[in-house]
Amino acid sequence: MGLEKSLILFSLLVLVLGWVQPSLGRESSADKFKRQHMDTEGSSKSSPTYCNQMMKRREMTTGSCKPVNTFVHEPLEDVQAICSQGQVTCKNGRNNCHKSSSTLHITDCRLKGSSKYPNCDYTTTDSQKHIIIACDGNPYVPVHFDASV
């Protein structure tokens, strides 16, 4: 009887650990957005190699070269506030995108045509544009960078 209870408890423990463990190291969509798109401290104005450095530092050149990425150089609170601004349709057809009401300081990184992994080489373009981001969750936070216009 004691062995049977122990076996049942052990089985339940294995089941629970198998369900919980895969989610432990998983990056949330909001955290991924921050890692891939937020750079409140920096700016590309002073460095033509900004994108090469940032894409590597933010782990977007691991296994392959991410072809395009945009960094936003504004406070996170300002970017999060876009989630309550003008709603627009996302490129994928969903209706959870929002367009910034004002232009923001951004840097576009584009993989150069001749660049091949593992030597990812990017062009760096600094600009002021409106951004379109997808927001989800409770609280409603940025989870995807859709476009700059």
UniProtKB/Swiss-Prot annotation:
The active site is at residues 37, 144. Residues 30-42 have a biased composition (Basic and acidic residues). Residues 1-25 form the signal peptide. Keywords: Disulfide bond, Endonuclease, Hydrolase, Lyase, Nuclease, Secreted, Signal. Its main location: secreted. Residues 30-49 are annotated as: Disordered. It catalyses: an [RNA] containing cytidine + H2O = an [RNA]-3'-cytidine-3'-phosphate + a 5'-hydroxy-ribonucleotide-3'-[RNA]; an [RNA] containing uridine + H2O = an [RNA]-3'-uridine-3'-phosphate + a 5'-hydroxy-ribonucleotide-3'-[RNA]. One of its GO terms (cellular component) is extracellular region. GO terms for molecular function: lyase activity; nucleic acid binding; ribonuclease A activity. Belongs to the pancreatic ribonuclease family. This is Ribonuclease pancreatic alpha-type. It comes from Rattus exulans (Polynesian rat).
